[in-house]
Amino acid sequence: MAESQSQGADQAQDLNNELKTRREKLVALRETGIAFPNDFRRDSTSDRLHAEFDGKENEELEELGVEVTVAGRMMTRRIMGKASFVTLQDVGGRIQLYVSRDDLAEGIYNEQFKKWDLGDILGARGKLFKTKTGELSIHCTELRLLTKALRPLPDKFHGLADQETRYRQRYLDLIANDESRNTFRIRSKVMAAIRSFMVDHGFMEVETPMMQVIPGGASARPFITHHNALDIDMYLRIAPELYLKRLVVGGFERVFEINRNFRNEGVSPRHNPEFTMMELYMAYADYKDLIVLTENLFRTLTQDVLGSTTVEYGDQTFDFGKPFEKLTMREAICKYRPETNVADLDDLEKATAIAQSLGIKIEKSWGLGRIVTEIFEETAESSLIQPTFITEYPAEVSPLARRNDQNPEITDRFEFFIGGREIGNGFSELNDAEDQAERFAQQVNAKDAGDDEAMFYDEDYVTALEHGLPPTAGLGIGIDRMVMLFTNSHTIRDVILFPAMRPQK
């Protein structure tokens, strides 16, 4: 223990000494008037250079005489007397620089370059060549310091093994970890591919309020804020659903939105209070049309983003090339709890007994539909590994979904699961204003009974429905969970650039 404390003290002292030295170097740079120049322009990035020239031999490069200008962060440096090799990292990756004293302006190599530190941002100009080992490199004829880094690279002393540091100081994580940079590149590609798919299918992207007088569109506990000018409390939105459906009433028949939602709930590997959703609404369609659309969307995304219809996640392989499985909620319960008699799920007393045998704590306000849903979540949800649609959700847990014509106790709704996780939720929308008003009233009763996730009564939305909502289907997909899947990430914090964290003391 004492030895560990001593090592920690030594590391802290080393770091303090390095910080002091770097600041002294900055003072000298300021005296020259070139501390932070802004007149250097690059014409190439490392990924483009590798893509175009990795396949060429050194003789070809010499014949071509390709001169390039690059800029980036100095990650490594090997000084060998009058010459050095530098690894430069930019947005596209890394490329090697060959720096020779005799090829630079007088004094640059010894008086400047050797005094620069790892982490400094450099600009370089020179001709491409390949080393004896075949590595594409730049033979520098010009080298400039563009930004002085006052702190060392994160791995020099204690690295970024601490996950909390990776999340709190994401910029360090991105500098040090190729995997993290790739994760967020894939996230960007996913967002772009979704937008392209939606536009190709005739949808219009819109934006709806992030602050709402009445939070709606989902069952969740909202964040509360205060609007000073209006002197009213407002809520960060838990979902955009009710505003998007107002737009369908107004005549925009296919709309979608990609944006953040906020839910004042717990943090877990699958939950962050601020998260990204894509919601879409399509007039003159039902939930079956959405199932087809969802299947096509995921098949297209995997192909466009990953170049394959199969996704590796941990020790599992998900196949998006095959037709997705479709089960009703009751079928799923019976499949993964074979001893269940399906008829018992239609009997309140027997369903209650099943739930209690599973250790489910039943609230007094729960009806049969909520109990069956809890049984499903306990027995089947984690077993839905391959892409699966679960249908026939009870009306009790689906306050915004249209009732099924043959059985009004269930709704025309589905949830989409991959790897035991819910990824999407869609349904035929309830467009009966009187039925919606009644369900809002039931939600208010549940809230009065202590359910702080129950919905508020949104009178303006009911008024919108009274003007006529066409037959409509709506879908919500969790972007963060989708990116987790595509990047083999096992916690949501790994796919959110700046996840919610408790402030450091």
Curated annotation (Swiss-Prot):
Cofactor(s) needed by this chain: Mg(2+)
Transmembrane as UniProt keyword: no
Any one Gene Ontology BP term: lysyl-tRNA aminoacylation
A cellular component annotation (GO) from this entry: cytosol
Catalyzed reactions per annotation: tRNA(Lys) + L-lysine + ATP = L-lysyl-tRNA(Lys) + AMP + diphosphate
Top-level taxonomic group: Bacteria
Principal subcellular localization: cytoplasm
Annotated residues for binding of Mg(2+) 2: 422
Disulfide bonds: none
Subcellular location: Cytoplasm
CC cofactor note: Binds 3 Mg(2+) ions per subunit.
Single GO MF descriptor: ATP binding
Keyword flag Signal: no
Residues involved in Mg(2+) 1 binding: 415, 422
SUPFAM superfamilies xref list: Class II aaRS and biotin synthetases (SSF55681), Nucleic acid-binding proteins (SSF50249)
EC nos: 6.1.1.6
Family the entry assigns: Belongs to the class-II aminoacyl-tRNA synthetase family.
Subunit structure of this chain's protein: Homodimer.
Name by which UniProt lists this protein: Lysine--tRNA ligase
